[in-house]
Amino acid sequence: MASIAIENAEPVPSDCKGDLKISKFDGDLPLKVLYCGVCSLPTEYCEYMPDVAKCRQWLEKNFPDEFSKLTLGISPKQETGTVEGQATSGEEEEKKKQKRGGRGQIKQKKKTVPQKVTIAKIPRAKKKYVTRVCGLATFEIELKDAQRFFAQKFSCGASVTGEDEIIIQGDFTDDIIDVIQEKWPEVDDDSIEDLGEVKK
């Protein structure tokens, strides 16, 4: 129905405010768009990205003629100041960020902490106790998995409370040493220390 209304509509004079003008494109179709190798956007949009300096360096290195076209509007003082000022920080960021297919960011080694598991019995209310196990993370044991294992093994509540601490509800100081050695053989008898009853 809408197409019929358009065909039957009378021509509108050009001096009307609601007149639509259709402009014709003079360039060749399809358009050839140059995409940036850093941000993967068309090079005209690189200026809106946070790492403009990297985009400019890439464009200057790979397409110097396009780079000169884009930098015509920028005064020489602005261009050199921005590129030099951000180039040093851009290079540092480039080292940190992982590139496609690259090695990625090098993880810093953790400080060598002595591998020791400590077990303590902490009094709670009246005659109730909780058992605290610390140091399992030094043996690269996942604390969440260990917490689940202890809760299942002793049929009680267990939770990861600290960076390297598991609290088990109940007094299991006698059994837990054997259970740890049985489950994780890399934890030997010398590296487990029983602190006995400790106050919070």
Curated annotation (Swiss-Prot):
Ranges of biased composition (kind: Basic residues): 97-112
MF (Gene Ontology): translation initiation factor activity
Polar residues bias (residue ranges): 78-89
Domain SUI1: 117-184
InterPro entries from the UniProt entry: DENR/SUI1_TIF, DENR_C, DENR_eukaryotes, DENR_N, SUI1, SUI1_dom_sf
Keyword Transcription regulation attached: no
Region ranges (Disordered): 78-112
A Pfam family that the UniProt record links to this protein: SUI1
Keyword vocabulary terms for this entry: Initiation factor, Protein biosynthesis
Record flagged with keyword Lipid metabolism: no
SUPFAM superfamilies per the UniProt record, alphabetical: eIF1-like
NCBIfam families on file: DRP1
Family: Belongs to the DENR family.
Entry function: May be involved in the translation of target mRNAs by scanning and recognition of the initiation codon. Involved in translation initiation; promotes recruitment of aminoacetyled initiator tRNA to P site of 40S ribosomes. Can promote release of deacylated tRNA and mRNA from recycled 40S subunits following ABCE1-mediated dissociation of post-termination ribosomal complexes into subunits.
Name of this chain's protein: Density-regulated protein
